[in-house]
Design a protein with these regions (language model features):
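Acidic surface patches and DE-rich sequence motifs
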Residues: 65, 116, 155-156, 202, ...
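Hydrophobic or amphipathic alpha-helical targeting/insertion segments
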Residues: 96-131
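Residue-level signature of beta-propeller blades and closely related beta-rich strand-turn architectures
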Residues: 77, 110-111, 157, 204, ...
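Residues that form or flank phosphate/diphosphate-binding pockets in enzymes
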Residues: 107, 201, 389
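Beta-sheet repeat architectures centered on beta-propellers
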Residues: 1-102, 231-246, 253-472
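Short beta-strand segments and strand-loop junctions that repeat across beta-rich extracellular domains
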Residues: 113-117, 154-172, 206, 312-320, ...
């Protein structure tokens, strides 16, 4: 009577619309590569969210300010330093943030606004006309960053970007402020810094600029580095983030079907699986441009989080040695989009903003609920062949005993990879019972193929591994 081991890191099923095989990704569960009880890894629920404070509105952006050793967060119409208000921010959309020795900058409503640490607020504008310095057509600010002693920002709808003056950050550089990413005639979509380079992200190329070291009045301070240019573009202003000592981004449909890439030494490496590309392809270019990417690290997980209008996708670099490992985050018992955004390590905890309500939260590892509400966790096994076999003892290793009350695990089976049948309820957690078995003794006879779905609804953390079944 052979015992078959079933992986839980990624299920396999079929798409009923086109008969293609697809991946069933874990929902609210992270894979951890660690030898546990004859398994090469286990799956752990994504940390829960507890309320931290009330704020002025939904989250619009966050940055860790190294000059002040504090987290600056834009929520609603306010700028927060930690949990205290320090300024008003116009508009309601996503904002870009950067900081320097004297100010925290926010790119909002086409302006670069500097919230100085002495309490004053300045907006970047041209020098007075009687100063004798060059007057620039500054236009509308699209994205901002900072390198060394200067802020840099891209001008919306053009291939131009500007730098601020060294002495007065509220004005462009008095002699050489304007530069152009000439490979991007449709305009710079986003701007960032990598090591000592300014990085300009367009729709079809990514261009790098380095300091020239020139000291002559009027000489160019930055020059393009064509050896580092990448022949891919980004989908939207916030569809990029620093990740793994480089940048990760969602590619623009201008360079083919969108995917997720990591830049490395003038080349790009794809990290998206076919199922992730199918999800990205389901969005139009305009909707995909509203995506937001961020990175997060905890407990040896290196996470890349992609917030899309209908999905939140997570790539875990630490468990992707045998192929890209993705999972899906969601809120509630249905397919509502995950509500937390703008994660950042603050003090000794990870804090986050919210997409739905005027609150900030913090990740807690001893719960899986979100603001006190139960969450659904889904795992799938691949389809496997069991021709005319009788199946017994479907068992999952579970780390139990921490629940406040008895939780149940819902098991269901599919024979076609599309439809899952009636759910079998099995107790999978109980207070202080640390060695509880999760066991379905009599599964039944299998005609041809079979796959299983595991569903847990709980407020407690979930840890599952080692799914096995006995065949006769």
């Amino acid at each position: 009577m052979p015992i078959q081991q079933l992986p839980l890191m990624k299920g396999v099923g079929k798409d009923f619309r086109n008969a293609d095989y697809i991946d069933y990704l874990p929902v609210n569960m992270l894979a951890t590569p660690k030898e546990i009880l004859n398994s090469s890894g286990y799956l752990r629920s994504f940390p829960g969210i507890a309320k931290r404070s009330d704020v002025n509105g939904v989250s619009r952006g966050v940055e860790y300010n190294m000059a002040q050793n504090a987290v600056y967060r834009v929520c609603g119409g306010k700028l927060y330093k930690g949990e205290s208000e320090v300024g008003d921010v116009a508009g309601s959309g996503r904002v870009s943030m950067a900081h320097g020795r004297t100010s925290q900058a926010v790119g909002v409503n086409g302006q670069l606004v500097e919230y100085r640490y002495d309490g004053t607020v300045k907006t970047v504008s041209n020098w007075p006309t009687d100063s004798g310095f060059t007057q620039y057509e500054l236009g509308s600010v699209r994205d901002i960053t900072r390198l060394r002693g200067r802020y840099a920002w891209s001008k919306d709808g053009t291939d131009s970007w500007f730098i601020t003056d060294l002495e007065d950050e509220s004005h462009p550089d008095r002699y050489s402020a304007q530069y152009r990413a000439e490979s991007q005639p449709d305009g710079i979509i986003g701007i960032g810094t990598w090591r000592d380079f300014i990085v300009c992200f367009g729709s079809s190329t990514i261009e790098y600029f380095s300091l020239t070291g020139a000291t002559t009045v009027g000489a160019a301070l930055y020059v393009a580095q064509p050896s580092l240019m990448v022949q891919k573009g980004i989908a939207g202003t916030y569809c990029k983030t620093p990740f793994a000592d480089s940048y990760a981004f969602i590619s623009n449909p201008a360079t083919g079907a969108p995917s997720v890439y990591i830049i490395g030494s003038g080349q790009v490496s794809p990290i998206a699986s076919a199922s992730i590309e199918k999800i990205l392809r389901s969005y139009t270019a305009d909707v995909l441009a509203d995506g937001v990417m961020e990175s997060l690290r905890f407990d040896a997980h290196e996470l890349l989080i992609i917030h899309l209008p209908r999905h939140v996708l997570v790539y875990d670099a630490s468990s992707s040695s045998n192929g890209p490992q993705w999972c899906v985050l969601k809120t509630g018992l249905y397919d509502d989009v995950y509500r937390a955004i703008d994660f950042i390590y603050e003090g000794n905890q990870i804090t986050c903003g919210d997409k739905l309500e005027s609150v900030t939260g913090k990740l807690q590892f001893d719960i899986s609920s979100q603001y006190g509400l139960q969450q659904e966790h889904l795992l799938f096994t691949p389809l496997f062949k069991a021709d005319n076999a009788r199946c017994f003892d479907l068992e999952v290793e579970s780390s139990t005993g921490v629940a406040q009350y008895a939780d149940r695990l819902f098991l269901s089976a599919t024979t076609d990879g599309i439809n899952y049948g009636r759910e079998q309820m099995i107790e999978q957690n109980e207070p202080f019972v640390y060695d509880k078995r999760v066991l379905w003794k009599r599964v039944g006879r299998i005609r041809k193929n079979v796959g299983f779905k595991l569903r847990v609804i709980t407020k407690s953390p979930v840890t599952l591994s080692g799914c096995s079944i006995r065949l006769e």
